[in-house]
Amino acid sequence: MALKILERIFGDYSAKVVKRHQRTVALINSLEPEMQKLSDAELAHKTVEFKERIARGETLEQILPEAFAVVREASIRTTGRRPFDVQLIGGIVLHEGNIAEMKTGEGKTLVAAMPLYLNALLGRGCHLVTVNDYLAKVGRDDIGRIYRFLGMSCGLIVHGLTSAQRREAYNCDITYGTNNEFGFDYLRDNMAMHPQDMVHREFFYAIVDEADSILIDEARTPLIISGPSGKPAEMYYTFAKIAERLKRDEDYIVEEKEKRVAPTEEGIAKVEKWLNVDHLYEGENQQLVHYLNNAIKAKELFHRDRDYVVKDGQVIIVDEFTGRLMFGRRWSDGLHQAVEAKEGVKIEEETQTLATITFQNYFRMYKKLAGMTGTALTEEEEFRKIYGLDVIAIPTNKPMIRIDHPDVVYKTVKAKFKAVADDVEERHKRGQPVLVGTVSIEKSEYLSQILTRRGIPHQVLNAKHHEREAEIVAQAGRFGAVTIATNMAGRGTDILLGGNPDFAARQRMRAEGYAPELIVAATDIIPSQDPEVQAAREVYLQYLKEEEAKCAEEAEKVRAVGGLCVIGTERHEARRIDNQLRGRAGRQGDPGESRFYVSLEDDLMRLFGGEMVQNLMNKLGIEDDVPIDSPMVSRAIENAQKKVEARNFDIRKHVLQYDDVMNTQRELIYKQRRQILEGHDTREVVLDAIAATAQSIVEEGVPEDVYFEEWDPSILVALAEDNGIPKGAVNVEDLKAAVEGVRREQEGREKLAKVIEQAAIRAYEEKEARLGAETMRQLERFLLLRTVDEKWMDHLDAMDDLREGVGLRAYGQRDPLIEYKMEAMEMFNNMIRSIQRDMVRNLFIFEVVREPQRPRIMIESGSQGAAPRQPVRAEGKKVGRNDPCPCGSGKKYKFCCGRAANA
């Protein structure tokens, strides 16, 4: 209410921004006739002219109108598309470092071209971040034509590229890629052993496509590079059997809202008896608690065909936001192994973290960050507080005429799905295309069975049928089409009324026996010189023309019956996910409808607010199959969603507070590591380490609780030798002589440390003279990098353990976050001291020998901090020319990324 009053007084912020930018748009439009007169060469030369003007002191803001006008004209000449005025406004919003909320079908891909071109004029590299390899490649190939026409290079970062290919892509003016690949490259750079292995440039400017998905949904998802930990797999099978024997609410408690489980006293007693151990929570047995909790979580919180599927003997995660199968990703902390044990499939080895960063901290490294999405306003506060980004709603090019019907609420799931089937059947008879959104594979298959029994032809799109995703979604707007889809339906593929002529033309070519790779090459944006491909392209263009005529005719029939109808079978936790589903209908001014069917047995209502409504319905004696349409129920649903959104925001904010501590430490370690890698003077680092080691030897050998007169010099000699200082370098006589006549204990300790330090430096200089300065620097660099990596890896594990246990401090009336910060700093300081001591020890012990280097085994992963982690495994196999391209486009490598690699 207060917000509405403020809006009436001060006006809507987005509307003010849009109005302000309309003056710039008018200026861009006034330049259009001038741009149209330029030849291709003259238009392309504008890039050189802009760079010269910037070198003379002009700002990007001064150049913006002309640069946008140039990109608009280049787009017309290369892609045949002219950016609308609202797209120009979106481009300005992105240049200013904001989130542009643009509805589905409004051409976000083209919008990004203008600010990317403008910022790339500075020569510092700009990134366009997408959610998958396919969209990154389509963007690079399609919009990349504009950049190349204007004399700018455009690179692509996808899975399966070599370091050289990645470095080349990053050195381009503009680079398209996925959030995972950008993040992993950053981590890999900070694990590199040679400068030439590093690929990233500076973090200058990035536009994040589907910003809500990457910056909000995956904000708690750490990217993890990990290696084998060597833990046994048998225990997971043992505890899977134990979990099956335990009873819910009697032997353990499940908190579904928090996704937590806790064994009861009765349950613990049973487990101790079955395992024949005395105390489950003491000593070495504590590791068993980890196995037990994971086994119970796997049993109660992770369900087959909802959270994962079992395919070819493997447990494959289903993305909760998109419904896609996440091949190669694994939950960490032993959870994936527990699910594998529950399903009785082969358990893969557990891993240990080598390097990690969350998307929140990765994207906050950019000097300027912007984003595009169809749904962001509901998360406006989070974008502003976490990333410092304002959300600006961009008006649609044509008025939105979609009809959004009020929710229909039923008591039971069964009654709800019957009503959905009735609605689908009635619309199907009229020929109106229907897209039904479900929240899980299980629900989509349940509805499919109902429609099959009624004889309604339909397509099912879920994680089990992901291979045909784009094809099924593209034809969901045909006359009479019925499509059932999980959340994956939507992003990346437009639903055109009357069907998609491009997909229809491809289908005809497949039916006539054209090879799949030939169809891919013939329909590629990049023209081919191959005569066979050119002939196939002629056929494709002919079929495309015919299908366009058919689809246009069918589109009119669909518009006459109301356009695409979107039916949601359940409200999602976040309103924006519901809005994404609604947004599939009514694109670009098309007619359309949407309606949500809800039951009080749905997870959202069951966990977050359906009890009051349930009690009211029971008191009124409302039957299961009688729908409710009441403002009170609608408010209850909206309040439940707001409650969950606020809770999830708090979780992400809480995670960030903890991760900021780790982030500060990460930046310090990576900065020092990079300096070593780039050839900074390692001798100074070693001398500092020797001084620190000498100090720690004295602290250990002459502790403060020992009278100085009672100290034993032989202990210091032994400690010096334990720390790698050559035997005889430190002797008892020198130590005694150093403190002779000293009265103050502190002064005595300082003198002892100086004796040990000088002895170590003499030994160090002798080794340097023997090996030569250059070899010594190489040895130092290698040992420093190796020691830092090993200690950092151990530190990550220790910080994870601290994070898991620190919450219990709240029971002692202590703030867990403050406790975490204090202990984390102490642990970090201990790690630095440990690095210094190990470095000194190894430097004296190691001798230079020529030996082949063993490859490091690495696994890349993404995970969720508060939610279970989801690692991604990286295969090191070389891709053959005729193999399927690893980017997921469906093309052969030689027709896809291989073309860019060999260009």
Curated annotation (Swiss-Prot):
Catalysis: reaction(s): ATP + H2O + cellular proteinSide 1 = ADP + phosphate + cellular proteinSide 2
Bilayer topology term: Peripheral membrane protein
List the GO molecular function terms. ATP binding; metal ion binding; protein-exporting ATPase activity
Q: For this UniProt entry, what is the primary localization, expressed as one broad class?
A: membrane
**GO cellular component entries:** cell envelope Sec protein transport complex; cytosol; plasma membrane
- Region feature Disordered, mapped onto this chain: 861-883
Compositionally biased spans, kind Basic and acidic residues: 872-881
Q: What Enzyme Commission number does this protein have?
A: 7.4.2.8
Which SMART domains does the UniProt record give? SecA_DEAD, SecA_PP_bind
Q: Which cofactors, if any, are listed as required? A: Zn(2+)
Q: Which UniProt keywords apply?
A: ATP-binding, Cell membrane, Cytoplasm, Membrane, Metal-binding, Nucleotide-binding, Protein transport, Translocase, Translocation, Transport, Zinc
The record's annotation in Gene3D superfamilies points to: Helical scaffold and wing domains of SecA, P-loop containing nucleotide triphosphate hydrolases, SecA, preprotein cross-linking domain
What detail does the entry give on cofactor binding?
May bind 1 zinc ion per subunit.
List of residues binding ATP: Q87, G105, E106, G107, K108, T109, D494
Where, by residue number, does Zn(2+) bind? C885, C887, C896, C897
Top enzyme class:
translocase
Task: Read off the HAMAP family from this record.
Answer: SecA
Subunit (UniProt): Monomer and homodimer. Part of the essential Sec protein translocation apparatus which comprises SecA, SecYEG and auxiliary proteins SecDF. Other proteins may also be involved.
Protein role:
Part of the Sec protein translocase complex. Interacts with the SecYEG preprotein conducting channel. Has a central role in coupling the hydrolysis of ATP to the transfer of proteins into and across the cell membrane, serving as an ATP-driven molecular motor driving the stepwise translocation of polypeptide chains across the membrane.
From the Swiss-Prot or TrEMBL record, give the protein name. Answer: Protein translocase subunit SecA
Q: Which organism is it from?
A: Symbiobacterium thermophilum (strain DSM 24528 / JCM 14929 / IAM 14863 / T)
